[in-house]
Amino acid sequence: PRHRYVDFNQGVDARLFTEENVKQLSRIAIRPLRIAFDNIKTEAQYTRAIEMSSKVGLKDFSNYLLYNFDDHPDDLYHRLRINVELCDRLNVSIYSFPMKYHPIRRTEDMDEDYSHNRDYIGKYWNRKYIRAIQAVLNSTKGKIGKGTSFFMKAFGENIEEYHKLLEMPETMIIYRYFFEWLGLENGGKKTAIEILGNDSICNAR
């Protein structure tokens, strides 16, 4: 027989999870369960929602991680790492899809109308950081799944390595294994610039 699954294509709100709600969700052939994790401030509620879901037998999860909004670049790293660690601890599968925020209409605090371009930069972000994240996602096909070693290779073993990655030339991020083979990834920034050209590295502003 053909197995069919229910997929709510919008993330449910982790703050509204109760034992009864999760019990009812577990009665549905839902795969994956999408739980919103757009703000690091909801970490406790989000983690609790994943734990509660795991206890009733739900094992497949997915979410979009909004960035370039009111968040700090470090927040994206922490949210991704939380998901990877939850996968390991609970033996579940969480696919994360970082999604760049872009306004669809102009508000009073904006200096221009961004509805017809992709130029919006969040308060704590800059163009270089956004391009670096997009370069990583280009290498991972837009998603981050389970696997600590994979995550650490993509985004860094700690926040300091993540910061270094944000400053890397995009070509060096996408073809990192090649540059490692050349021995240029660590301590070879000057040489990399000479190879790639000064235009590959832009000011972090």
Where are these regions (language model features)?
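Auxiliary Fe-S-binding modules of radical SAM enzymes
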Residues: 70-205
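Generic structural signal for well-ordered alpha-helices
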Residues: 22-25, 46-54, 76-84
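Core AdoMet radical
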Residues: 1-49, 59-68, 93-97
